Swiss-Prot record:
Name of the protein in question: ATP-binding cassette sub-family C member 3
Segments in the Cytoplasmic topological domain: 54-73, 121-132, 193-301, 369-424, 470-531, 596-958, 1038-1080, 1124-1194, 1239-1522
InterPro entries attached to this UniProt entry: AAA+_ATPase, ABC1_TM_dom, ABC1_TM_sf, ABC_transporter-like_ATP-bd, ABC_transporter-like_CS, ABC_transporter_C-like, MRP, P-loop_NTPase
Keywords: ATP-binding, Cell membrane, Glycoprotein, Lipid transport, Membrane, Nucleotide-binding, Phosphoprotein, Repeat, Translocase, Transmembrane, Transmembrane helix, Transport
Taxonomic lineage from the root: Eukaryota, Metazoa, Chordata, Craniata, Vertebrata
Native source species: Rattus norvegicus
GO MF annotation: an example: ABC-type bile acid transporter activity
Positions with a binding annotation for ATP 2: 1318-1325
């Protein structure tokens, strides 16, 4: 390098130590200043150029119009280029004139000139690519300024020393150059305007990060405004920024889907296409399930999707690991402070370098973390989206294998695991790198003794590996328990009403607690192993230090351990400690994530529906539906459900499908939808499809949204759908009209209303083909007739459309075009009604037995038509008596109407319409003003708590852990930190031996005490970890038990108004946080708190001057802490609230996938799910940014601590003990991390303790009456007679609502059979709920056998009554469990009841018999079969009081007749209360109760009621029974 300097005015030396180092006035040689110092910015820019050009080429953000700022920056670049060339020409001029300039005067101007030209071109290229603030160029200009400062000073000092300027030309050009680069740097800090057509210009609340400058991005200053706002008031959702395009779900999910599809393609071989063509009429792309040669790797798909983010994060991490303060410069800086005879400026320079390098490390580290955490958020988002999309395409057999709860677990727990482990991914290579670097520099200081420490690390790795493998085993088992628990809880929440009616809560409670016990045992084992792993890795740095220093002083007596070696080594050991301490967390996280990865991958590899199962194009002319030789099964592993099906349905035909329960009617509809496995044959369906399932699927949204179902509003068509489906009048009594929010699963609608809404959805869709799976079973006979006439029949709005109607209503069959008769999965007969009668087969015999008498009066004429209209009107006005208060005088109005109609009947139909309208109007006028549509909300919105987490929450958790345990943990942590300080002070005293005695004495004693203190610290760490584990698991057990017991005892009204997803969120995510997040957070808080306190104490004790800056730094730290905690806490709460809708929507979607696919609305639901995930991301992204903002600002405080401790050590180096100074500096280098972690863990604690707050909230909700009152038990054998009596009984659904039963008084004799009828919402089901005390009395009493039911426990009551509910609910498990969960009955008893309930043939045909596995909700049984199972339950219990709530609505007439016979014989001496739609089933009952508007309208024998000509007579006449 000296040859570059020449021998002229620059001298002949490139570097001169006497000029630069060993002097009190340091300077650099002129040659160094004009060469390397000037080249540094150029080298940086050229090195960064390839990567930066690659980035600009692939990240076009728009086009920025040429502005004044851009012109100025360009002009400065051009001027700097000119200055460089002027310098170069001046050098050539000197050469020509014989002055022989040094080579550096040619090289430097040439290099700088070319670099300035490059910078100028980059300015314009950035503008064209839409870059508003260039970090690359800002660093370049900053380096130019910094590298020019030293020549700036040197030239002035030289001129002053010489009394003249030696080279006026270069002196002048240099200061012009300095002024220009300073201006360029200042201008580069300003931002350009947003690019044209930038999303930022359209967004009302864009994220400020997008428009932030380089330094703002680097320091996260752009977050400050939100931090201040969050400190001033609780943040709201409207305060949060919009998501950037790159973070939106649809974009992130699509990228992962493409990568996953490539994996599937590679796995299935080149012959398999990744994507199947789109199906006509559908918006989604379904993946075709094909046999695969190998399983696709989801991990590879993730890596390929997020490679760029991983690499960028890795680059930041690599720079941070190699930064000076993290390795040898840390040692060099520290050692310079211990030299009392060197120049003072050495210490000040090294202190400054420590501060600058620490600050750079902070900024780079948090850029790394921001990049990785944003990637982690995107990974979670992508996984949720992929799982959601997969759930829309899985087969029915997969749905039976994976319950809703298990799939929710995949989205909540498993996806979150990926987000939690992502920040540690780079430790896989970074930790070994840091260890290698630390050991390398230890070698430089201690020589081969450093290898002893390496040996310790190598020996401990297999031990920890064995521990981690065992932990993985426990983790897999624990996840299975967790899945089972969440699955069971999901079923309990979905079937909670049935559990209450049957008093089955204890057995399911026992099941949950049994699963929970196994889960906790595995958690405890895993946590113990985690504590052992923590002990190993906490002891590892100490063991390395001990053995390394011990070997060093023992192998050679000449090896002296002085302060410089000890504490430089200790600083390196502390650097070594960071990756080693993080390794247990990494191993634990990777173990858990590997389990989650396998679970997600297994789910994504499950079979999907074949989109080509149903052909949409190739079809016979004139045919809408064709099945040729079709054989179908619900699973490839199961025997066929439908055999040899051959059907051809013409366009516009109305086809009825009939047959007994379980014959395959619903399966045939599913086959047409492509929901079954097609084993043989071909299916063709031409045109769009609308599907009305047997059990209506209703969304948790408004009635209008349920009907429109994603289609644009067409007022005329919408009005027609409501009118024909008899919903118009409902709107007058619903509190919000068609904007009324229908609760989860349509909870606030009756079964009939849900079915009519489902039918209205189909009508509004205006599809070509309508598949109607028994839509008339859930409605009254007159409503069924209206719907058939107005919608389905030959004169209905669907006339001309192709309709396939599954029905048990034989009165509609004559109006169909032809009928398909199914039996045992095969078509036995097919033809027109008259043809089948003439055929004289089984269908004809069935009709002769069950069809109404054709000689009875036909349901035609003016009177009947008007009566039907009034019945519909009454039905509507009686609806929702829990929501509105309609006029109670309906009966009188109806009688008046009937009298007038009788007198007008001869005048013809045309004249009775005005009368009808007039009476309709009069009824509407009599509806009170309380019906005004103010709000239709039923589900209570979940509102985030605000302000500080209440101290009572912390107190509750501390009590759950155990107050003594909590105090003991605090003492253990205080003890272990005191021991750690003692060990380091002892080491400090050890190093002072050399200073005081000139040699080291008692080395073995020193080493022994140091070892003892270290081992004691490790034991205290392990003991504290074990104690925390015991306390945390105790707390988790108590909190879960309290939550479970409270929720299972909550009243039914709570479940009606609270989405199950919200409750399930408490049992899944919040319990997970309490299990696995809260305890480590508390341990980290204790550790960082005591470490920070220890650090301050040691620094103050070592350098008392440090007290001067403690207060200012503490004030700044306090401000940052208060701003951060207030903001992050509220962001965490908002995130928790926004999380529940994701899982609620997912649960809702999974139950309605067949409907969603049938209507082709898959894409709409994807968009809706993405919107809910994006809403959650809007809260998570600021939370991530808040952590980075905190880190930068708090670590700045820590870096100031490092700076001031070093400065004060330099100032007082002549009077301070070198050992204590070394101890002070080594502690100061740790304080940055400990202060940061203290605030972060404190905030994390506040954020995570919210899980306790949320669990406690649902652990203290109002509960039902006690299950058992020991002081007032029911008598043995009660009830004996079954006498039921209501005395002035009134009830409402919830406080503040109107009464649904009003002063009900009636007496039912023991053994009496009573039918209960009335319009929808008249109070029939409410009456039965009151009998079971699902609803508690507002006033009045119910007596059974003279005992007031309100005076005994709920289980004493409910266990002695039996109900067959309207909605048959089964639970996953064996058939035996569903019949006898308590195991009270023998197999013989169960088989006898199955025989009586006509299920024995089906159960006998199953290989497992009574151990036949029912899927969740009983989905692998038909609705009719499920109702038969409910009948079998009733037969087993054989109570004295039996309630039938429309129990045979979904059963064919023949089976219904058999069941009614069974009930008559088996419950002959029991009191039977039957709510019936089919009036023929109660015509032989002792009495019939007619309810109207919650009051008794009629109560007498059927014969007397028909003779009286009242309401019951009208209903019987409609049904053809009078």
């Amino acid at each position: 390098m000296d040859r570059l300097c020449g021998s002229g005015e620059l001298g002949s030396k490139f570097w001169d130590s006497n000029l630069t180092v060993y002097t009190n006035t340091p300077d650099l040689t002129p040659c160094f200043q004009n060469s390397l110092l000037a080249w540094v910015p150029c080298i940086y820019l050229w090195a960064a150029l390839p990567c930066y050009l690659f980035y600009l080429r692939h990240h076009r953000l728009g086009y920025i119009v040429l502005s004044c700022l851009s012109r100025l920056k360009t002009a400065l670049g051009v001027l700097l280029w000119c200055i460089s060339w002027v310098d170069l020409f001046y050098s050539f001029h000197g050469l020509v004139h014989g002055s022989s300039p040094a080579p550096v005067f040619f090289i430097t101007p040439l290099l700088v000139g070319i670099t300035m030209l490059l910078a100028t071109l980059l300015i314009q290229y950035e503008r064209l690519r839409g870059v508003r603030s260039s970090g690359v160029l800002i660093i370049f200009w900053l380096l130019c300024v910094i590298c020019a400062i030293i020549p700036f000073r040197s030239k002035i000092l030289l001129a002053l020393a010489e009394g003249k300027i030696l080279d006026p030309f270069r002196f002048t050009t240099f200061y012009i150059y300095f002024a220009l680069v300073l201006c360029a740097f200042i201008l580069s800090c300003f931002q350009e305007k947003p690019p044209l057509f930038s999303p930022e210009n359209l967004d009302t609340n864009p994220c400020p990060e997008a428009s932030a400058g380089f330094f703002s991005r680097l320091s996260f200053w752009w977050f400050t405004k939100l931090a201040i706002l969050g400190y001033r008031r609780p943040l709201e959702d409207s305060d949060l920024w919009s998501l950037s395009e790159e973070d939106c779900s649809h974009k992130v999910v699509q990228r992962l889907l493409e990568a996953w599809q490539k994996q599937q393609t590679q796995a299935s071989g080149p012959q398999t296409a990744a994507l199947e063509p789109k199906i006509a009429g559908e918006d989604e792309v379904l993946l075709k399930a094909r046999p695969k040669t190998k399983k696709p790797s989801f991990l590879r798909a993730l890596v390929r999707t997020f490679t760029s983010s991983l690499l960028m994060g890795a680059c930041f991490k690599l720079i941070q690991d190699l930064s000076p303060s993290s390795t040898h410069s840390c040692s060099a800086s520290s050692s310079g402070l211990f030299r009392p005879h060197g120049p003072y400026w050495w210490g000040f320079l090294l202190a400054g370098l420590m501060f600058v390098s620490s600050t750079m490390q902070t900024l780079i580290l948090h850029q790394h973390y921001h990049c990785i955490f944003v990637m982690a958020l995107r990974i979670r988002t992508a996984i949720i989206g992929v799982i959601y999309r997969k759930a829309l395409t899985i087969t029915n057999s997969v749905k039976r294998e994976y319950t809703v709860g298990e799939m929710v677990n995949l989205m909540s727990v498993d996806a979150q695991r990926f987000m939690d482990v992502s920040p540690f991914i780079n430790l896989l290579w970074s930790a070994p790198l840091q260890v290698i670097l630390a050991i390398y520099f230890l070698w430089q200081i201690l020589g081969p003794s450093a290898l002893a420490g390496v040996a310790v690390i190598v020996l401990l790795i297999p031990l920890n590996g064995a521990v981690s493998m065992k932990m993985k085993t426990y983790q897999v088992q624990q996840m299975k328990f967790k899945d089972s628990r969440i699955k069971l809880m999901s079923e309990i929440l979905n079937g909670i009403k049935v559990l209450k009616l049957y008093a089955w809560e204890p057995t399911f409670l026992e099941q949950v607690e049994g699963i929970r016990q196994g889960e906790l045992q595995l958690l405890r084992k895993g946590a113990y192993l985690q504590a052992i792993s923590t002990f190993i890795w906490v002891c590892t740095p100490f063991m390395v230090t001990l053995i390394t220093l011990g070997v060093y002083v023992c192998v050679d007596k000449n090896n002296v351990l002085d302060a410089e070696k000890a504490f430089v080594s200790l600083s390196l050991f502390n650097i070594l400690k960071i990756p080693l301490n993080l390794l247990p967390q990494l191993i634990s996280g990777m173990t858990q994530t590997s389990v989650s990865l396998k679970r997600i991958q297994d789910f994504l590899n499950q079979d999907e529906l074949d989109p080509q199962c149903v052909e949409r194009k190739t079809i016979s002319p004139g045919r809408a539906i064709t099945i040729h030789n079709g054989t179908f099964s619900w699973s490839k592993d199961l025997p066929p459900t439908l055999h040899s099906i051959n059907i051809q349905i013409p366009k516009g035909a109305l086809v009825a499908v009939v047959g007994p329960v379980g014959c395959g009617k619903s399966s045939l509809v599913s086959a047409l939808l492509g929901e079954m496995e097609k084993l043989e044959g071909a299916v063709s369906v031409k045109g769009s499809v609308a599907y009305v399932p047997q059990q209506a699927w209703i969304q948790n949204c408004t009635l209008q949204e349920n009907v429109l179902f994603g289609q644009p509003m067409n007022p005329k068509r919408y009005q027609q759908a409501l009118e024909t489906c008899a919903l118009l009048a409902d709107l007058d009594v619903l509190p919000g009209g068609d904007q009324t929010e229908i609760g989860e699963k349509g909870i606030n609608l009756s079964g009939g209303q849900r079915q009519r809404v489902s039918l209205a959805r189909a009508v509004y869709s205006d599809a070509n083909i309508f598949l109607l799976d028994d839509p008339l079973s859930a409605v009254d006979s007159h409503v069924a007739k209206h719907i058939f006439d107005q919608v389905i029949g030959p004169e209905g709005v669907l006339a001309g459309k192709t309709r396939v109607l599954v029905t048990h209503g034989i009165s509609f069959l004559p109006q169909t075009d032809f009928i398909i008769v199914l039996a045992d999965g095969q078509i036995t007969e097919m033809g027109h009604y008259s043809e089948l009668l003439q055929h004289d087969g089984s269908f004809a015999n069935f009709l002769r037995n069950y069809a109404p008498d054709e000689n009875q009066e036909a349901n035609e004429g003016v009177l009947q038509h008007a009566n039907e209209e009034v019945l519909l009107l009454e039905d509507t006005l009686s609806t929702h008596t829990d929501l509105t208060d309609t006029e109670p005088a309906i009966y009188e109005v109806r009688k008046q109407f009937m009298r007038e109609m009788s007198s007008l009947s001869s005048e013809g139909e045309g004249q009775n319409r005005p009368v009808l309208k007039r009476y309709t109007s009069s009824l509407e006028k009599e509806v009170p003003a309380t019906q005004t549509k103010e709000t239709g909300a039923l589900i209570k919105e979940e509102i985030a708590e605000t302000g500080n987490v209440k101290l009572s929450v912390y107190w509750d958790y501390a009590k759950s852990v155990g107050l003594c345990t909590t105090l003991f943990i605090c003492l253990l942590y205080a003890g272990q930190n005191a021991v750690a300080i003692g060990a380091n002070v002892w080491l400090s005293a050890w190093t002072n031996d050399v200073e005081e005695h000139g040699q080291q004495n008692n080395t073995s004693v020193r080493l022994g005490v140091y070892a003892t203190l270290g081992i004691l610290q490790g034991l205290l760490v392990m003991l504290s970890a074990f104690t925390m584990v015991v306390g945390a698991i105790q707390a988790a057990r108590l909190l879960h038990t309290a939550l479970l017991h409270n929720q299972i005892r909550a009243p039914q009204s709570f479940f009606d108004t609270t989405p199950s997803g919200r409750i399930l969120n408490r049992f899944s995510k919040d319990i997970y946080v309490i299990h696995e997040v809260l305890a480590p957070t508390i341990l980290m808080l204790f550790n960082s708190f005591y470490t920070s306190i220890s650090t301050i104490v040691v620094i103050v004790a070592s350098t008392p001057l440090f007290c001067v800056v403690v207060l200012p730094l503490a004030v700044f730290y306090g401000f940052v802490q208060r701003f951060y905690v207030a903001t992050s806490r509220q962001l965490k709460r908002l995130e928790s609230v926004s999380r529940s809708p994701i899982f609620s929507h997912f649960s809702e979607t999974v139950t309605g996938t067949s409907v969603i696919r049938a209507y082709g609305r898959v894409q709409d639901f994807k968009v809706l799910s993405d919107a809910k995930v994006d809403s959650n991301q809007k809260t998570t992204y600021p939370y991530i940014a808040s952590n980075r903002w905190l880190g930068v600002h708090v670590e700045f405080v820590g870096n100031c601590v490092v700076l001031f401790s070093a400065l004060f050590a330099v100032i007082g180096r002549n009077s301070l003990n070198p050992g204590l100074v070394g101890l002070s500096v080594s502690y100061a280098l740790q304080v940055t991390l400990s202060l940061n972690w203290m605030i972060r863990t404190l905030s994390d604690l506040e954020s995570n303790i919210i899980a306790v707050e949320r669990v406690k909230e649902y652990s203290k909700t109002e509960t039902e009456a006690p299950w058992v009152l020991e002081s007032n038990r029911a008598p043995e054998g009660w009830p004996r007679s079954g006498v039921v009596e209501f005395r002035n009984y009134s009830v409402r659904y919830r406080p503040g609502l109107e009464l649904v039963l009003k002063n009900l008084t009636l007496h039912v004799q023991g053994g009496e059979k009573v039918g209960i009828v009335g319009r929808t919402g008249a109070g029939k089901s409410s009456m039965t709920l009151c009998l079971f005390r699902i609803l508690e009395a507002a006033e009045g009493e119910i007596f059974i056998d003279g005992l007031n039911v309100a005076h005994i426990g709920l289980h004493d009551l409910r266990s002695q009554l039996t109900i067959i509910p309207q909605d048959p609910i089964l639970f996953s498990g064996t058939l035996r469990m569903n019949l006898d969960p308590f195991g009270r009955y023998s197999d013989e008893d169960i088989w006898r009841t199955l025989e009586l309930s006509h299920l024995s043939a089906f159960v006998s045909s199953q290989p497992t018999g009574l151990d036949f596995q029912c899927s969740e909700g009983g989905d692998n049984l038909s609705v009719g079969q499920r109702q038969l199972v409910c009948l079998a339950r009733a037969l087993l219990r054989k109570s004295r009081v039996l309630v039938l709530d429309e129990a045979t609505a979904a059963i064919d007439l023949e089976t219904d007749d058999l069941i009614q016979g069974t009930i008559r014989t088996q419950f002959e001496d029991c009191t039977v209360l039957t709510i019936a739609h089919r009036l023929n089933t109660i015509m032989d009952y002792n009495r019939v109760l007619v309810l109207d508007k919650g009051v008794v309208a009629e109560f007498d024998s059927p014969v007397n009621l028909i003779a009286a000509g009242g309401i019951f007579y009208g209903m019987a006449k409609d049904a053809g029974l009078a």
